[in-house]
Amino acid sequence: MQDIFIRDEGEGFPLVLVHGFLGSSAMWKPQIDFFKDNFRVITPDLPGYGKSNKAKSHNSIKSISNLLLDCLREKKIDKFHLLGHSMGGMIVQDMAKKSGEKISKLVCYSTGPRGEMPGRFETVEQSRENLKKKGLETTAKNIAKTWFIKGEEAKYFDICIDSGKQTSMETADNSLVAIKNWNGVDALKNIKNETLIVWGDQDKSYNLEQIQTLENNIENSKLIIFKNCAHNVHLEQPDQFNKTIKDFLL
């Protein structure tokens, strides 16, 4: 699809990884390197992010999920595993609601069904205000610090900063609007896919109540909690994260 960059590596059954707010496909590097030996790994840059930064950004989770489904249809990928992180986890919940029959196994990772994000380190509206007052670079850096136990000393912190820098102010604000206005709680009961829920116990973006809402309402779900991890488990404990996902998928 025009202006949408999709990294496509490896061979085998398709595994689609959807990044979150201020992210990009580059943030999946440890996963791409690991999974491409067993899977065809599909990692899109969402519209307005990464190498899709020339594409028009969206202010609705539903419209982003429609776009991704269209992209997969265009690539003739009719059946796939699907993993979404953070805002990407909201997107994959909506994709499962619309096209659950196309999804073999689903992973909801460091995400939740409530867009207002109760218990977040700051409200979504505060993040919007910070964007306006402090600018994108400072706001993105401050947010990324909360994604790791070690903050900016974390090994993969710079990947997150580089991804954030490729994002425009308009895209960042539109994403926050999309997050705030989305609520997927009522649709969870309709997700019939075998689902793995992954969460770090020090996550400052999505609290335990959000995770438990997923677990209690998705019928065929299993929860795995990583100890001493914040929001970006896949970059804090990549080896254990990758093994956990592989064991679930195979």
For each of these PLM feature ranges, what is it?
Residues 4-54:
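Conserved HGGG/HGGXW glycine-rich cap/lid loop of the alpha/beta-hydrolase fold
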Residues 33, 42-83, 243:
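Active-site loop/oxyanion-hole signature of alpha/beta-hydrolase fold enzymes
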